[in-house]
Amino acid sequence: MALPCSPLRLPVRFAIAGFVALAAACNDSTGPQARLSDPQGLSSDLQAVDGAFQSSTFQSFSALSFAPGSPVAAPSRMGALLAAAPIVPPRARTQPYASAPARLQALRLAASVLSSGISANVIPPTMYGQTWVWDEGTHQYILSPDPGPNNGIRIILYAIDPITGQIVEPPVAVGYVEFLDWSTPSTDSLQVILRGGTPSVPGTTYADYAVSATVTGDPPTAFSATAGGFVSDGTRTLTFGATFAVTQVDTDNPDTQIDVMWDIDNPVIHVELHETLAQSDADHLALTLTEFSITRGAETVSMHGTITSVLSTEAFSINLVVDVNDVPWIRIRGTQNGATVRHPNGSDLSPEEGQAFLDLFFLSATIEFAVLNLFTPAGSFMGA
């Protein structure tokens, strides 16, 4: 991965996604040097994780937000709740600053939407017991006479065109999703269950997770949310647990603490994220990445450091270190005008290390996109 040792002159939106892949081998620093024990094995394991999100049922679920007539297309309290606590594995923190403003906004929006007080339900009670199906005649979802869950709604899922993401006609059912409301007077809570088969003969459970939230004050001054559950393709399973908390919600500079853990069973990988987001004012954001780590066997690859950003101009500075078992492996430094990715002792990444490095970052971007699809349909329904 030998490239010219010059800053990358790219627009911020491209530099955000591209500097990791392009600036990988400039030599100008010294220090202790770690090595991956098996970079090719790490790449192989990371690539295998994609399978947890490849079931046809999961893909069909991801299309619900855009399907005409879908009951999850209208904003409501539920969207705010789900957007506030995404179960997204960060893009292996290639650009942790990129999603930070959106995450803060989602948390503030959720607190605002829910600020009227935690209600006894997230889904309107008038929708309880409903089942929604695709109608080929009108090319949209319609309410079915079939009964749904007593405390929520059911939506039948159909095969989609892999190119357009639209439901194929004539429709072919591939599973169903249920949104179950477990809210209490003190906590908004929603469970999402994604299954193959039919309601009368359920098949594989591809996802089962819950999101809950509480708000302090009216208008709100603090907000907290938790999320937990699993995603599977029937062979691989990714389980997760997360907590999100924001203070100073009633100002233009809220502070946020995020703690998330993921565990993948095949291959066995453990992921942790601990970070804080702080705003000195409405335009300046500082992210402190305490830990983003991936553990595989006896080896832990972890990232830590800081990113500061000016939201109005998209200017940013980044200073991160990637360790292998607590010994520095890679340093990432730069601004929106250019960044470098190199060993701390100045040596180039080997081709195998370079591939593992890219897989570490960009496979997690794939996971992020896939898991976002878990929240987008319900998020639209709930007001996100």
Could you tell me what each predicted segment is?
Residues 109-234:
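Long, acidic/polar, low-complexity amphipathic helices and coiled-coil-like
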Residues 237-353:
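Intrinsically disordered, low-complexity segments enriched in Gly and acidic/Ser/Thr residues
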Residues 27-153, 324-384:
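N-terminal "mature head" segments of proteins
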Residues 17-20:
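Processing junctions and N-termini across compartments
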Residues 2-15:
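Bacterial N-terminal signal peptides that target proteins for export
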Residues 164, 184, 199, 267, ...:
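Generic "edge-of-domain/loop-turn" microfeature
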Residues 205-214, 243-244, 375, 384:
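Edge beta-strand at a domain terminus
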Residues 22-25:
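C-terminal motif of bacterial Sec signal peptides marking the signal peptidase cleavage site
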